[in-house]
Curated annotation (Swiss-Prot):
Its cofactor is Mg(2+). HAMAP family: Fen. One of its GO terms (biological process) is DNA replication, removal of RNA primer. The gene is fen. Belongs to the XPG/RAD2 endonuclease family. FEN1 subfamily. It comes from Korarchaeum cryptofilum (strain OPF8). This is Flap endonuclease 1.
Length: 342
């Protein structure tokens, strides 16, 4: 879901993948996996599956998209969520409810043969299971791509790594990374290409875009702390929907009038079970770890081929071709080329 602060962000720089060649990018793994689950589908919205009915849309996205990053000279570091904060339970419940409703509408659309509607609802109907997560970690490890296990929110950990300078930017479709302090956020990194507009036979080009935290703060005349307060007012994953009657523009006015969170939240009708100061403090000081390695490793090609082809029924010819490209990318990136870029 993420925080809805897009109205505050005007300075977006469109990127080509070549613009970030040589950079290490920390990706919100779950955000990327849900993008792949939504995008890699058959015409009726059904995800890719093995003959046993095991979903492989996410496997496909992780494998082929990550290989393309490496080919472009980009080192992706996938950051996986850890334990959710206790006050995120409502957001999780809401997602489960929305998935159940979408699944019902998907099946209804299939029954009447409305493939357009079926595909739309299918994108929201499926979940990332624990088995899919473990499979994706295995694929990345066999590719030699770094993975990081966050103690809590993946975006918080990615932002921490960016603030330390261990990665150049974070990557996610959500803006939460900015509230967690990421100096740079790249959106659309995992969905670059053409995307169909909802309900229309129209396709638009989607390119990565760079957002810099300092530019956002300077343009709006606020601090990061005030940005966090705006996020809480309009709604985060921890207080869905935000404070009634307050949109982004009104929130901006309020944080400029009441600069301390204690003053601000005492002036608005707060109707959530969670204390707003707890959310504020979580964004400022989330649990993170320094126990990670961002270096690219040599791919385990034989094991990767077996895992993709024998266990998950991918095309042997195509997988072999991509593995050869991964091996070449590793030689390029580990042979001194990366240091000259990063």
């Amino acid at each position: 879901m993420g925080v809805k602060i897009g109205e505050l962000i005007e300075d977006k720089v469109e990127l080509e993948l070549s613009d970030i060649a040589g950079k290490k990018i920390a990706l919100d793994a779950f955000n990327a996996m849900y993008q792949f689950l939504a995008k890699v589908r058959q015409p009726d919205g059904t995800p890719l599956m093995t003959s046993k009915g095991e979903i492989t849309s996410v496997h496909s996205g992780i494998f082929y998209r990550t290989a393309n990053f490496l080919k472009e000279g980009i080192i992706p570091i996938y950051v996986f969520d850890g334990e959710k904060p206790s006050f995120k339970s409502r957001a999780i419940e809401e997602r489960v409810r929305a998935r159940e409703e979408a699944e019902l509408k998907w099946k209804e659309a299939l029954e009447i043969g409305d493939l357009e509607e079926a595909r739309k609802y299918a994108q929201a109907a499926l979940n990332i299971t624990g088995d899919i997560v473990e499979d994706c970690k295995t694929i990345l490890k066999l590719m030699g791509v770094p993975i990081v296990q966050a103690p809590s929110e993946g975006e918080a950990q990615a932002a921490h790594m960016a603030m330390k300078g261990d990665v150049w930017a974070t990557a996610s479709q959500d803006y939460d990374s900015l509230l967690f302090g990421a100096p740079r956020l790249i959106r659309n990194l995992t969905i670059t290409g053409k995307r169909k507009l909802p309900g229309k036979e129209v396709y638009v080009d989607i390119n990565p875009e760079l957002i810099e935290l300092e530019s956002v703060l300077k343009r709006n005349g606020i601090s990061r702390e005030q940005l966090i307060m705006i996020g809480i007012l309009v709604g985060t994953d921890y207080n869905l929907g935000g404070v009634k009657g307050i949109g982004v523009k009104r929130a901006l006015e309020l944080v400029k009038k009441y600069k301390r969170p204690e003053d601000l939240f005492s002036k608005v009708p707060w109707e959530f079970d969670v204390d707003p100061i707890s959310i504020y403090e979580f964004f400022l000081n989330p649990p993170t770890t320094d126990d990670y390695d961002t270096s690219l490793k040599r791919p385990m090609s034989d094991e990767l081929l077996k895992f993709m082809v024998e266990e998950h029924e991918f095309s042997e010819e195509r997988v072999k071709k991509v593995i050869n490209e991964i091996e070449e990318s590793y030689r390029m990136l580990s042979g001194g080329g990366l240091e000259s870029w990063f």
